[in-house]
């Protein structure tokens, strides 16, 4: 009775065990596991992966500029973010895909295989990039290695044409140890495709990517020839923010100074106005000095622009001071007590009666008050009247000379203004020509 009950139970247990055994998979049963084990079991990453040691391993390079992070003109350093790709053939990592469940591509750890020792010659800082520990290997032994790199490289930055400057920085890739007989370099894409490819570039920074030209060359040294590929990153600065914050305010201040020439030469407000413009320009120049890049090699053209504009403002103020000085000296030479250098501002421009004339008027009043009591008073009154008449004639001559002198100074002021305007125009044309020549505008 018991045996009849246990028999079906044992049958169920055996069926369940068979099903579990069928559904359980072990890594040893995976074709991918067998393939990776077979490829790496006897692999030596210290040996260049060729069967014929006289055959060079060709490494194909490609580069995508992702972003321009920083341009340090003072330290001559460029920081860029690039996508870098290496492709080479490893003869020790090929297989027949039909023997491994039609697997045509596999990912392997980069640390377990041979990799070319490619470096960037212009590197000046430790590269920082995400750790991508795997590479793709296909059945023919072709390996693809992708590297997003943040490159901090040395670059000869020319800021003379700032803010319309165009920079050309190079990134040179070469093997640090292997000569061209062992490791050769080549382009993964044609240089024409690399030059005009901007699809990966983030064009929302201060710089615009113009092109990425590339050249192949062999560097000869005492140890032999080394293959190298140089990528020239050509970029142009977006000048709008600097034009608005630096150039336009400076141009406005220069135009305001030109407008001050329409004030009369003998107007006191003219010198005060020009002095205020000069002080305002000096404060503006000090506040904006941090926006101009500093370079040891050369001073940016905009620095010369600020200096010459300030020199023009000083020249304009000095010219007005000289004109007022001429007018002041002329008035001092015309009479004993000088007039003020500016007309119409005080009571000094009204005719003043000398003490002698004042006494004459008083005497005349007193004489008439006494009804001409003394017989000699008529002669004295006549003498005083003649003195007043002579003074008025002298005053008229002085006013006429002053008017003629003002006309002469106005003509001289107009001549100086035209000369000032001519020099300013020549300077503006020269500055724009230099910016266009150096900046490639």
From Swiss-Prot:
It is found in: Postsynaptic cell membrane; Cell membrane. The HA-stretch region of HTR3B seems to confer increased conductance to HTR3A/HTR3B heteromers compared to that of HTR3A homomers. It catalyses: Na(+)(in) = Na(+)(out); K(+)(in) = K(+)(out); Ca(2+)(in) = Ca(2+)(out). The chain crosses the membrane at residues 239-259, 269-286, 304-324, 415-435. This is 5-hydroxytryptamine receptor 3B. Forms serotonin (5-hydroxytryptamine/5-HT3)-activated cation-selective channel complexes, which when activated cause fast, depolarizing responses in neurons. Pfam families: Neur_chan_LBD, Neur_chan_memb. It is a multi-pass membrane protein. The lineage of its organism: Eukaryota, Metazoa, Chordata, Craniata, Vertebrata. N-glycosylation required for membrane localization. Disulfide bonds join 155-169. GO terms for cellular component: cell surface; neuron projection; plasma membrane; postsynaptic membrane; serotonin-activated cation-selective channel complex; synapse; transmembrane transporter complex. Keywords: Cell membrane, Disulfide bond, Glycoprotein, Ion channel, Ion transport, Ligand-gated ion channel, Membrane, Postsynaptic cell membrane, Receptor, Signal, Synapse, Transmembrane, Transmembrane helix, Transport. Residues 260-268, 325-414 are cytoplasmic. CDD domains: LGIC_ECD_5-HT3B, LGIC_TM_5-HT3. It comes from Homo sapiens. Changing residue 138 to S: Reduced molecular weight. Very little expression in the cell membrane.
């Amino acid at each position: 009775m018991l045996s009849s009950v246990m028999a079906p139970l044992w049958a169920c247990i055996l069926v369940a065990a068979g099903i579990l055994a069928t559904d359980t998979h072990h890594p040893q049963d995976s074709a991918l596991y067998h393939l990776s084990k077979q490829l790496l079991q006897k692999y030596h990453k210290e040996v260049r992966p060729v069967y014929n040691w006289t055959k060079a391993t060709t490494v194909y390079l490609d580069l995508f500029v992702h972003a321009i992070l920083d341009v340090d003109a003072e330290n001559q350093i460029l920081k860029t973010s690039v996508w870098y790709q290496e492709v080479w053939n490893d003869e020790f990592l090929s297989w027949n895909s039909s023997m491994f469940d039609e697997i045509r591509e596999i990912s392997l750890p980069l640390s377990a295989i041979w990799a070319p020792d490619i470096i960037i010659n212009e590197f000046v800082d430790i590269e920082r990039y995400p750790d991508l520990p795997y590479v793709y290997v296909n059945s023919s032994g072709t390996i693809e290695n992708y590297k997003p790199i943040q490159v901090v490289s040395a670059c000869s930055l020319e800021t003379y044409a700032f803010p319309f400057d165009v920079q050309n920085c190079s990134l040179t890739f070469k093997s640090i140890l292997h000569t061209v007989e062992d490791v050769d370099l080549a382009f993964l894409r044609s240089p024409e495709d690399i030059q005009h490819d901007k699809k990966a570039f983030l064009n929302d920074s201060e710089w615009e990517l113009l092109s990425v030209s590339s050249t192949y060359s062999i560097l000869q040294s005492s140890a032999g020839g080394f293959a190298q590929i140089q990528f020239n990153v050509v970029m142009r600065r977006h000048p709008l923010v600097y034009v608005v914050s630096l150039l336009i305010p400076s141009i406005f201040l220069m135009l305001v100074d030109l407008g001050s020439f329409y004030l009369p030469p003998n107007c006191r407000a003219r010198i005060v106005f020009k002095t205020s413009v000069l002080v305002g320009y000096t404060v503006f120049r000090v506040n904006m000095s941090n926006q101009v890049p500093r370079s040891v090699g050369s001073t940016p053209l905009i620095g010369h622009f600020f200096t010459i504009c300030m020199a023009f403002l000083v020249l304009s103020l000095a010219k007005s001071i000289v004109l007022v000085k001429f007018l002041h000296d002329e008035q001092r030479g015309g009479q004993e007590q000088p007039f003020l250098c500016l007309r119409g501002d005080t009571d000094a421009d009204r005719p003043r009666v000398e003490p002698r004339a004042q006494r004459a008027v008083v005497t005349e009043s007193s004489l008439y008050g006494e009804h001409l009591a003394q017989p000699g008073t008529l002669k004295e009154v006549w003498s005083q009247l003649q003195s007043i008449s002579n003074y008025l004639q002298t005053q008229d001559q002085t006013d006429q000379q002053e008017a003629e002198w003002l006309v002469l100074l106005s003509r001289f002021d107009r001549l100086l203004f035209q000369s000032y305007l001519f020099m300013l125009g020549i300077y503006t044309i020269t500055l724009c020509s230099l910016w266009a020549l150096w900046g490639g505008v």
